C-alpha cells in the first residue's frame, strides 16, 4: 500500500526535508512511493535529518495493517550509503475516523503500557507509536520484516495514515538514506469480501 499507484500520498508537512548539499542526489521523498524501486538509477532519498528523519503517507482508503518491512541494499564501495542507512525506526499510526469512538483511547492506553508514555509523533500528536524496530545492515537480508505487536494485532485498528521516523542511522551525521518501506494490509471492503466468502479460489 506504500505506492502512488495504490493511491498513497505523501504527507509533506509531516515528512522531513531533502538533503540539498552539493553532493545530494536530487531524489525526493516522493520516490519512495514508486511502484519499482529500480525506476531510476539512484533511488535512495537522502533525508536532511540524521536523527528523527520522518516519512509520512496517507492511504487512499483506510487499511488494516498486516505486515511492515524495510528494504536497503548492500554497498561494499559506498560507505556513505551504509552509514546513512536507518538503524532505529519508530512506526506511528493515525486512526481512521470510521473506527469506534472508544478505540482511540484504547490504542493510546495500550501504547502507554507497551511502548511508554512518550508515544505520540512530535509533529502531530494524532499519530500513535506502536513499536520501535531495528534494521540490521550486517544482516544479509536486504528486506527485513517488522512484526506487528500482538496487542496491536488483537486491537485490529483501521488506519488512515502511517509515519516512519528514523531515530538513528548507522553513523552518518549529515543525512539519512532511505530506499523502500513495504506496507501490506487489507481494506475494510476487502475484509467484507473475504468474510462473506464472495471471493473463492478454485
Question: Each PLM stretch: what is its role?
Answer:
Residues 1-30:
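Predominantly extracellular/luminal regions of secreted and cell-surface proteins
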Residues 2, 56-60, 83, 170-173:
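Short amphipathic alpha-helical molecular recognition features
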Residues 17-19, 42, 133:
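Intrinsically disordered, low-complexity segments enriched in small/polar residues
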Residues 18-20, 65, 171-176:
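Short, surface-exposed beta-strand/loop "edge" segments at domain boundaries and coil↔beta transitions
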Residues 26-34, 38-39, 47-51, 76-202:
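Trp- and acidic/polar-enriched beta-sheet ligand-binding modules for extracellular glycan
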Residues 42-61:
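Short beta-strands within extracellular/lumenal beta-sheet-rich domains
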Residues 61-79, 164:
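A short beta-strand element within beta-rich, extracytoplasmic domains
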